[in-house]
Amino acid sequence: MSSSKSLYELKDLKNSSTEIHATGQDNEIEYFETGSNDRPSSQPHLGYEQHNTSAVRRFFDSFKRADQGPQDEVEATQMNDLTSAISPSSRQAQELEKNESSDNIGANTGHKSDSLKKTIQPRHVLMIALGTGIGTGLLVGNGTALVHAGPAGLLIGYAIMGSILYCIIQACGEMALVYSNLTGGYNAYPSFLVDDGFGFAVAWVYCLQWLCVCPLELVTASMTIKYWTTSVNPDVFVIIFYVLVITINIFGARGYAEAEFFFNCCKILMMTGFFILGIIIDVGGAGNDGFIGGKYWHDPGAFNGKHAIDRFKGVAATLVTAAFAFGGSEFIAITTAEQSNPRKAIPGAAKQMIYRILFLFLATIILLGFLVPYNSDQLLGSTGGGTKASPYVIAVASHGVRVVPHFINAVILLSVLSMANSSFYSSARLFLTLSEQGYAPKVFSYIDRAGRPLIAMGVSALFAVIAFCAASPKEEQVFTWLLAISGLSQLFTWTAICLSHLRFRRAMKVQGRSLGELGFKSQTGVWGSAYACIMMILILIAQFWVAIAPIGEGKLDAQAFFENYLAMPILIALYVGYKVWHKDWKLFIRADKIDLDSHRQIFDEELIKQEDEEYRERLRNGPYWKRVVAFWC
C-alpha cells in the first residue's frame, strides 16, 4: 500500500465520538483490494489495518456476505433500480451519473444493491456512451441480414427500426422523468400500468435476453478467430475468452469499467477509420477494383429473392437483427432523466438518437451495400464454403486492401468481447433486481463485501457454458438461436414500454390529470407510441411467418420455427404460469384503478411554463450560434 495509509480501514480512535471520514478516493477502491468490511473495533488501532493480514486472506474474505448496517455503508452507494432496464453496453454510465451526485435518489433504502460499489469515472462513461450499439448485431449479425435481404432490404429494415426507436425514446423519456426512482426501472412500468403478469413475463424475458448474449458473443468470438485460422479447435478460444470475461468480472465494477474503456476506444477508432476508408475504396482511391459506386446494387441486385414474397421475408428477417443492434439505445432517455435539467436534455437525447441512427448505423450499412455483394460466400449465413467473416472485414479485404482487414477483425474481436463482458456483468445485476422486485428467489440478492452479486454471477457463468458448442458443426445454428432470442426479447421490452406509455396517458385522461404535471411530454405523443407498438406487433407477426416458412422454402419447418421464434413461447409460458400461480385472470389494470401518485414526481405546471418562456427569451436575446446549437442539439 502507498504511504497515504489504508483509507479503507480508518477506525475510531480511543472510542471517541469523532469519526475519521474517508476521502473521495474510497470510491475508487474495490473491496477485495482493501480487506475487511467489519464494524469499527472497540480496540484502539493506529488508523489502518494490521500488516500481518495477507493479501490472499483479504481476497477470500471479500467473498463473504456484505453487512447491511449504517456504519458499513460508508463506501456503499445506491445502485439505481433503473439498471434492470439498461443495456449492458451502457448500464454503468448511469451508475457513474448516480455516483457523481451526493444525494442519490432512494439512497439508504436497505436494498441489497446498496452494497454495489461506485467506482466508475467520467472517462469511463464517455467511452461507454460513445461505444453503445457497436457490437455483434452491427459488426457480425449484419452479414446474415445482408444475405437474406440484400443491400436495399438491409437499409429498409434499419430505417424502419430507426423510426420505431425514435418514438420509443420519446415515450421512455416521458416516463423515466416522472418515475425516476421506481424500483425496476422501465421493466417495472408494465407491472403497475398494464398488468402484473405481463410485467413479470417481460422482466424475465429481458433477463433471459442478456443471459443469451454472453454465450452468443463467445461463439461469435470463436467465429471471428476463424478469419486467421481454422486448424485450432474453436473451444480452445472459447475457454480463453470465457476465463477472461469471468476474471474481469471478479474485479467488479472497476474491472468492468477499465475493460470497457479500452474496448470502446478501439471500437470508436475502428468505425471512424472504416467510414473514411470505405468511401475511399468505393470511389477507387484504394484497392485494385477501381471505381465501384453502386455496382452491387445492380449485380447481384438490391434485394435477394426472385419473388416479391421472398424479398419481403428478407426485410422482415432483417428487422430482428436491427432490433438486436439497436438494443439498449433507450438507455439514453433514462440517463438524461437524471441530469441537472432533464426537461431540456431529453429532447437533445432524441436528436442524438437521430444522429446515431443516421451516421453510426445507416451510413455504414450503405457503405457495406456498396462494397459487399449479398452473394459473397464469406458472409455469415451464406451457403458457400468460404471462411466466414464480418462484412466489415470482407468490405476491405475483397478489394485488395492488405493488412487493414486484420486490424479490423482484431477490433471486431475486441468489440465482441466487450459485449460478452457487458452482458455477463449486466445479467447478474438483472437477477439481483428481479430478486428485489420479488420476481426471483432471494438467494440471488446475495452481495459480497466487494459488491459482487456472487450467486447471480454463478448462474450467468453456468449459462455461458453454452458457448462451448463452438466446436460443433451446428455452430452457426446455435448463433441463430441465441440471436433470435435476444432480438425478439428486445422487441418485447420495447413493446412493453410503448404499451405502458399508452396506458399511462389513458389513466391521466380518465382520472382528469393535466399533462402539465409532466416534466417532459413525448414529442410524438400517444400516436408515436401507438405507431411503434403496432409496428412491433406486425414485426412479430412477420417474424412468425418467416419462422414457420423460412426464406427460400415453401414448406413449414418446425425446427426453423424454434430457431427463430423461441422467445415467444417462453414469454407466453411465463405469463400463463404467473396467472395460474396467482389465480389472477384480469387482462389489464383498469385506467381508473392505475395508481398515478405512488413513485411519481409531479411537476408544477405554472413553473414549467415560466421556465420555458425564460428559456425561449434567452435564446432570442442570445447570440445566433446558441440558437443554432439549440436547434440541432
Swiss-Prot record:
One Pfam match: AA_permease
Predominant location: membrane
Record-stated family: Belongs to the amino acid-polyamine-organocation (APC) superfamily. YAT (TC 2.A.3.10) family.
Lineage summary: Eukaryota, Fungi, Dikarya, Ascomycota, Saccharomycotina
Organism field: Saccharomyces cerevisiae (strain ATCC 204508 / S288c) (Baker's yeast)
UniProt membrane topology term: Multi-pass membrane protein
Record localization: Cell membrane
Biased composition (Polar residues): 34-52
Stretches for region Disordered: 32-52, 86-116
Gene name per UniProt: AGP1
Protein's name according to its UniProt entry: General amino acid permease AGP1
Role noted for this protein: Broad substrate range permease which transports asparagine and glutamine with intermediate specificity. Also transports Ala, Cys, Gly, Ile, Leu, Met, Phe, Ser, Thr, Tyr and Val. Important for the utilization of amino acids as a nitrogen source.
Post-translational modification comment from the UniProt entry: Palmitoylated by PFA4.
Key words, A-Z: Amino-acid transport, Cell membrane, Isopeptide bond, Lipoprotein, Membrane, Palmitate, Phosphoprotein, Transmembrane, Transmembrane helix, Transport, Ubl conjugation
Cross-link (Glycyl lysine isopeptide (Lys-Gly) (interchain with G-Cter in ubiquitin)) at residue(s): K11
GO biological process entries: amino acid transmembrane transport; amino acid transport; serine import across plasma membrane; transmembrane transport
Extracellular face residues: 146-148, 219-231, 282-313, 374-402, 474-477, 553-560
Lipidated positions per record (S-palmitoyl cysteine): C633
PANTHER family hit by this protein: AMINO ACID PERMEASE (PTHR43341), GENERAL AMINO ACID PERMEASE AGP1-RELATED (PTHR43341:SF17)
Ranges per topology, Cytoplasmic: 1-124, 170-197, 253-260, 335-352, 426-452, 499-531, 582-633
